[in-house]
């Protein structure tokens, strides 16, 4: 690898680091004779783990950080005086293959600034994926960031070679997008999303009729929203996410806490730290929407338009509805057990299965994996000595569960807990 390409790599990897929608999840490509690489499905993270324990990494890079747009919130905006670089299609393909051969990566996450026009940029992204698949027989994971405003033909071609395509909404409300990025609009984002959805549904029907039809975007599509750069409430953001999840091909909405990279622009809020706690709460609420059968209006409403930063959304909901608790863990249905703070999907299923043979008590629940520190106030079962939420009052339970602030709070330190026990 020559020094010129290494210098470009350093610049373009730095420019790509603010994109959080990087995931090697949702698709499996097994190594086949005559192909290079393989990937194992993971869950929504840049680094995933294969079945044999290997750590899976993606090369996360931009094709170029030159851009014709001057978005206020973007480090790569046209007016910024920053180091710029562009990789040719062949340079990026060779870089990906070389990194794979060295066992640095298992896949590619590729985005780009927009140069000339959306179609010109999209065509170059497609060429990278096409050359990797057809010329080098690369069988690893490829995630392409589709360019807003790109043509249907290019989006459809990209879908033949990429495992996942994503088009970023960036700012949830169009009027706020126009304030910070006057050259952009939501129409140019939603149109490629529709192309991807139509392509997936058409491909699904074709595969029923013809045996060897290639798969189209097997890992579906995703999008990303910036949180904290504008005035949207969490309610606005979650309603938009919920509507996006109604589309069968939308696999993931990512939330990126606004990082103040262009402090000179007075249209932007002067934040000392990115709103990481808020970002974390949005991910937890998103989890409730997708896996816990919650509706948006149960998590946020006109009275509570923003998520509580001190407690997680499920606990917040339970404390607002003490009349529904405590539930008898040995009698309640699965849907209600799933809503108990401290009980995740896996634990709820184990509870349903285990109670058929014997009544469950404190120690059985703890052994299953229930976080009794939270759950004990919302359930009744054999041998449970703790008083419930109605006896202690929601305020009392909240006081017991909210962590006591330390002398010096470091807002940067967070535990993004998306384990089973939510």
Q: Residue ranges of each PLM-predicted region?
A:
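Flexible, acidic/Gly-rich N-terminal and inter-domain linker regions that tether
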Residues: 1-66, 371, 379-380, 387-408, ...
């Amino acid at each position: 690898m020559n020094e010129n390409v290494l210098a470009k790599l350093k610049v373009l990897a730095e420019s790509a680091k603010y994109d959080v929608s990087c995931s090697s999840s949702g698709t499996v490509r097994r190594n086949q004779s005559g192909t290079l690489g393989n990937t194992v499905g993971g869950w929504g993270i840049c680094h995933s783990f294969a079945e044999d324990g290997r750590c899976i990494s993606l090369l996360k890079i931009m094709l170029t950080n030159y851009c014709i747009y001057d978005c206020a919130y973007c480090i790569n905006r046209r007016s910024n005086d920053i180091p710029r670089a562009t990789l040719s299609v062949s340079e990026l393909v060779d870089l990906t293959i070389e990194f794979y051969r060295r066992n640095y990566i298992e896949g590619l996450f590729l985005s780009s600034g927009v140069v000339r026009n959306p179609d010109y940029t999209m065509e170059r992204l497609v060429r990278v994926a096409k050359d990797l698949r057809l010329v080098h027989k690369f069988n690893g994971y490829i995630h392409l960031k589709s360019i807003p405003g790109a043509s249907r033909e290019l989006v459809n071609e990209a879908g033949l070679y990429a495992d996942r395509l994503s088009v970023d909404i960036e700012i949830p409300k169009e009027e706020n997008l126009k304030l910070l990025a006057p050259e952009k609009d939501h129409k140019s984002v939603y149109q490629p999303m529709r192309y991807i959805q139509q392509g997936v549904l058409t491909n699904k029907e074709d595969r029923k009729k013809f045996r060897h039809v290639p798969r189209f975007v097997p890992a579906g599509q995703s999008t990303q929203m910036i949180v904290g750069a504008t005035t949207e409430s969490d309610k606005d953001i979650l309603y938009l996410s919920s509507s996006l999840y109604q589309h069968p091909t939308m696999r993931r909405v990512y939330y990126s806490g606004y990082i103040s990279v262009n402090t000179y622009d007075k249209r932007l809020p002067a934040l000392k730290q990115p709103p990481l706690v808020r970002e974390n709460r949005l991910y937890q609420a998103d989890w409730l929407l997708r896996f816990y059968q919650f509706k948006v209006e149960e998590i946020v409403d006109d009275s509570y338009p923003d998520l509580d930063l001190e407690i997680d959304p499920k606990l917040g909901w339970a404390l607002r509805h003490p009349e529904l608790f405590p539930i008898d863990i040995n009698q309640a249905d699965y849907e209600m057990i799933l809503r108990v703070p401290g009980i995740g999907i896996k634990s709820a299923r184990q509870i349903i299965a285990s109670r058929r043979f014997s009544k469950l008590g404190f120690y059985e629940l703890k052994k299953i994996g229930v976080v009794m520190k939270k759950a004990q106030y919302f359930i009744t079962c054999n041998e449970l000595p703790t008083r419930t939420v109605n006896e202690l009052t929601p305020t009392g339970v909240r006081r017991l569960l909210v962590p006591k602030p330390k002398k010096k709070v470091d807002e940067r330190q967070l535990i993004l807990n998306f384990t089973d026990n939510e």
